[in-house]
Structure formats: structure tokens, C-alpha cells
């Protein structure tokens, strides 16, 4: 596994994995990846003897796993982006409803929703985050152009509800939010600083 070295690389790697998951899911859905592509076992190599995993899939399981792969990869983009923004900008301030503050708060709440349940994400904002956050992002079109889209979340109304991609502008809005955050990280010198290792408490 390649080590992530900077906040910029962290976001890029997570987005790359999300895009990869989308392509895999599409290939499964269009039968370009089928049960015939899989062996009945695989081996995870490590410094020891490795681990052999034996498993058989059904067609329904394969399709469900493809969709879940996309969902989990999306969660990883929120986690990587939230942490990268923390590395570059420091602690978040829930009362900050500026565009940057809103982008950070929205990304953090998406991250937290997945943390509560990875496959069934739920909004559970803390009271201090129950503000309305608003940020305008650029959504890419097939033509190569972009159009502005405003993402607005009133966190006081979302508590306990299942997260829906429509809550933050669908996939176009979410990719626009990722791009907004990435550009902020990329434009700051700290975006190229060493990505901190976890600290034991």
C-alpha cells in the first residue's frame, strides 16, 4: 500500500478510488464483469504466510457489492477531504457560515454521517452545527463547461434522517464540493506539507 504523503495526495487518491469504484460498478451493471471473472478464492499476501479467502458470489451479491463499493469509496473521499482541510486550515468553527466555513462543515457532516453507518449513512449533527451552511460550487458538464450550483444544508432539519446524495446537489454537486475543497487545499502551501501520522492518545 502506497503511503499518502500530503493533503493534496490524500484527496487525489480518495477521488481516484471513488472513480475506480464507479467504473467497476458500471462494468458489473453492464455485464462486462460477471461471476466468470472471479476465482473461488484469493490470497492476501503479507510478511507471513498470507491469508487465503474462499468465497463464492451470486449475481445479486455481485451487483449489490458493486453499489456498496461506490458508497464506501464516496465515504473515503469525505474522510480524506475533511482531514486534509483540517491539516491545512486547523480546527473547524461551527459558527463559521462563510463559503469556506460552510464547505468544511458540510464535508465534516457527510463524513460523520458515514461514520455512524457506512452503508446506511445518517445525519446526526451535534447541536453546535445546527446552522444553515451554504457554498456555491462549479459543476462539470459533459461538454467540458461548468455551471454554478449552490449547496445549502440546514443542519437543524436533518438530524436522524438518512443521508441522500440529493441533500448536497447530487453527484454533480458533491464532485463540485470536492473540487472546491481540493482547490483550497492545493492553493495553500500547507497542502504540500507532510501528511501527519495518527497520534496515540
PLM ranges: what are they?
Residues 101-126:
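Histidine-centered, metal-coordinating catalytic motifs and their short helical/loop contexts
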Residues 13, 17-30, 73-88, 131-201:
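Amphipathic, Lys/Arg-enriched alpha-helical patches that create a basic surface
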Residues 93, 120, 124, 147, ...:
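Intrinsic-disorder/low-complexity coil detector
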Residues 1-41:
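N-terminal, charge-rich interaction modules
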Residues 26-102:
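Short, contiguous, well-structured surface segments enriched in hydrophobic/aromatic residues
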Residues 2-5, 97-104, 170:
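Short, structured coil/loop segments at alpha-helix boundaries
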Amino acid at each position: 500500500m502506497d503511503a499518502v504523503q500530503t493533503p493534496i495526495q490524500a484527496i487525489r487518491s480518495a477521488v481516484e478510488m471513488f472513480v475506480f469504484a464507479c467504473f467497476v460498478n458500471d462494468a458489473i451493471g453492464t455485464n462486462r464483469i460477471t461471476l466468470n471473472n472471479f476465482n473461488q478464492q484469493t490470497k492476501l499476501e503479507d510478511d507471513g504466510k498470507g491469508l487465503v479467502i474462499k468465497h463464492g458470489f451470486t449475481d445479486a451479491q455481485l451487483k449489490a457489492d458493486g453499489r456498496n463499493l461506490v458508497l464506501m469509496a464516496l465515504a473515503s473521499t469525505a474522510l480524506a477531504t475533511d482531514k486534509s482541510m483540517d491539516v491545512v486550515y486547523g480546527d473547524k468553527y461551527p459558527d463559521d457560515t462563510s463559503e469556506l466555513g460552510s464547505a468544511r462543515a458540510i464535508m465534516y457532516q457527510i463524513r460523520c454521517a458515514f461514520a455512524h453507518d457506512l452503508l446506511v449513512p445518517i445525519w446526526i449533527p451535534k447541536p453546535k452545527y445546527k446552522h444553515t451552511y451554504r457554498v456555491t460550487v462549479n459543476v462539470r458538464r459533459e461538454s467540458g463547461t461548468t455551471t454554478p450550483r449552490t449547496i445549502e444544508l440546514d443542519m437543524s432539519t436533518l438530524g436522524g434522517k438518512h443521508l441522500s446524495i440529493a441533500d448536497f446537489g447530487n453527484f454533480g454537486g458533491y464532485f463540485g464540493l470536492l473540487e472546491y475543497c481540493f482547490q483550497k487545499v492545493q492553493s495553500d502551501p500547507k497542502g504540500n506539507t507532510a501528511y501527519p501520522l495518527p497520534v496515540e492518545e
